[in-house]
Curated annotation (Swiss-Prot):
Leucine-rich repeat protein that likely mediates protein interactions, possibly in the context of signal transduction. Keywords: Leucine-rich repeat, Repeat. LRR repeats lie at residues 229-252, 253-275, 276-297, 298-321, 323-344, 346-367, 368-390, 391-414, 416-437, 438-463, 465-484. GO terms for cellular component: plasma membrane. A motif (GVYW) lies at residues 485-492. Gene3D superfamilies: Ribonuclease Inhibitor. InterPro entries: Leu-rich_rpt (IPR001611), Leu-rich_rpt_typical-subtyp (IPR003591), LRR_dom_sf (IPR032675), LRR_domain-containing (IPR050216), LRR_R13L4/SHOC2-like (IPR055414). The keyword Repeat applies. Widely expressed but preferentially in roots. SMART domains: LRR_BAC, LRR_SD22, LRR_TYP. This is Plant intracellular Ras-group-related LRR protein 5. It comes from the Eukaryota.
């Protein structure tokens, strides 16, 4: 390098060889993400340290310690993987900071009357970013190296081609893929890309974010920055591997729909109760064993799906959800529905199939707005006697239980259209005598029971179109009649009742003329 021009050209070539500089927002996102990961790691490591071998355990202490150390090592490895992209961004930014200062030093040398003058200061070699506590730059000092990405002043460059020591304004993002990744089909988001997307969405006041099946499998928790999405109205995080929700989720104050189904969430933060505008919440297919006490604050919630979890009880606070219309708790381990359920005065649909219910509380019968009640595959022996108050009930399914009888009060729920009492096997032996009151009944499944007779009122079920009677020891109903359909059975019962009435009238004892004469004789003697 014999000439100044050759040295300048080589300096600029080296400068141009760097990858594009991260945008300020991306650097701040990476910094925040690393801080979040470190915080989460501390919590996880503390939880591992608190693991204690029980005295009754047969596991040797040394083996137990090996187990704990392996869990810690896994946490550290996962931390490294999660912060890899963020660390790369900060390392790249660190190099750009150093190069910018070196360019300024070179410019100072060229601008100086005596180019051999000592340089104003030395610049240390940049070290890789390891911890969020040691960020080697300030975001306000970031300078772009490429004039196609900056707004230049008229004197941005010297005549020799070196960058002047002014600070151009960054206009474009160098991580545009992270910004638009939500729209790229097939690509899953890493932690840094998710964090970047959250930052951009927060600045744009995004109202809807769909990340269904879009997060990498290794991503088990969400960054605290999620709470910045205060304008978000709909959020879909379903079908991922999320295990923990950040406490900052309570900051989503505009949220009306939250879909978290098919994740691995074991516990909800208390801050979930701060989502006061929430209308629809889907938590199905997770690992929840309880609900937070703050749940009672979700007074605008209309649809709640808790199916396919590990719930053993529903809290009494469920009765505070006065706007709740649909509640799905199918496929849990629930043994009892709380009496406070009567407080859900807007309830239209209650699904509690595949649980361990032994009975339904009388309070269920007071849900006058309820239209659908399905409790299949439980251990229910009896239904509430208050069911006559269910003025809007249209569908009732109590199949595959241990039902011993159907209360007469149900026959006053005259809006009933579908009734399934099938597969109660040896326990159910009769139908209520007033079943004919159910004038709107269209479908009746009474199969696989021990019912021997149909009530005479059956003849008034004029709207019945589907009837399942298989595997019952019916004594008065020929099989060929049942094979003809529901209305054939109704007509048969009508004919049977009329025939019996006619027969009973014919067999009534009539007064003979001898009895009449004796009667008059007795009257005259008196």
């Amino acid at each position: 390098m014999d000439s100044k021009e050759m040295v300048v050209e080589e300096i600029m070539r080296i400068h141009r060889s760097l990858p594009l500089r991260p945008e300020i927002d991306d650097v701040e996102t990476a910094t925040s993400l690393i801080q979040n990961v470190e915080k989460e790691d501390r919590n996880r490591l503390e939880a591992i340290d608190k693991l204690v071998k029980t005295s009754s355990s047969e596991v040797p202490l040394e083996l137990f310690n090996v187990f704990k150390e392996m869990k810690k090592s896994l946490v550290r490895f996962q931390s490294t993987e999660q912060t890899r992209e963020a660390t790369k961004i900060l390392d790249l930014e660190s190099v750009h900071v150093v190069f910018d200062e070196l360019i300024q030093r070179a410019s100072f040398c060229i601008a100086s009357p005596n180019s051999t003058t000592a340089l104003p200061r030395s610049v240390p070699v940049p070290a890789p970013v390891v911890s969020s506590d040691e960020i080697p730059f300030k975001s306000k000092e970031i300078i772009s190296r490429d004039d196609t990405f900056v707004k230049k002043a008229k004197s941005s460059f010297y005549s020799d081609g070196l960058l002047a020591p002014s600070k151009p304004q960054v206009l474009d993002s160098t991580l545009h893929q992270a910004k638009n990744v939500a729209g790229n089909d097939g690509e899953k988001l890493s932690l840094i890309k998710l964090a970047s997307l959250i930052e951009v969405s927060a600045k744009k006041a995004t109202q809807e974010l769909n990340l269904q099946h879009r997060l990498m499998d290794q991503l088990e928790w969400l960054p605290d920055s999620l709470g910045k999405l205060s304008s978000l109205v709909r959020l879909d995080l379903s079908e991922n591997c999320i295990m923990v929700l950040p406490a900052t989720i309570g900051g989503l104050i505009s949220l009306t729909r939250l879909d978290l189904h098919s994740n691995r969430i074991g516990q909800l933060p208390e801050s979930i109760g701060d989502l006061l505008n929430l209308v629809n919440l889907n938590l199905s297919g997770n690992q929840l064993s309880s609900l937070p006490s703050s749940f009672n604050r979700l007074i605008h919630l209309e649809e709640l799906d808790l199916s396919s979890n590990s719930l053993s009880i529903l809290p009494e606070s469920i009765g505070s959800l006065v706007s709740l219309k649909k509640l799905d708790v199918e496929t849990n381990n629930i043994e009892e529905i709380p009496h406070s359920i009567s407080g859900c005065s807007s309830m239209e649909e209650l699904r509690a199939d595949y649980n361990r219910l032994k009975a339904l509380p009388e309070a269920v019968g007071k849900l006058s707005t309820l239209e659908i009640l399905t409790v299949r595959y439980n251990n229910i022996r009896q239904l509430p006697t208050t069911m006559s108050s269910m003025a809007n009930l249209k569908e009732l399914d109590v199949s595959f239980n241990e039902l011993e009888s159907v209360p007469e009060s149900l026959c006053y729920a005259k809006t009933l259209v579908k009734l399934n009492i099938g597969n109660n096997f040896a326990n159910l032996r009769s139908l209520p005598g007033l079943i004919g009151n159910l004038e709107k009944l269209e479908e009746l499944d009474m199969s696989n029971n021990q019912i021997r007779f149909l009530p005479y009122s059956f003849k008034t079920l004029s709207n019945l179109r589907v009837l399942q009677t298989e595997q019952n020891p019916l004594e008065e109903l020929p099989r060929d009649i049942t094979e003809k359909g529901a209305q054939a059975v109704v007509q048969y019962m009508n004919d049977l009742v009329e025939a019996r009435n006619t027969k009973s009238q014919r067999t009534k004892p009539k007064k003979s003329w001898v009895n009449s004469i004796c009667f008059f004789c007795k009257s005259s003697t008196n």
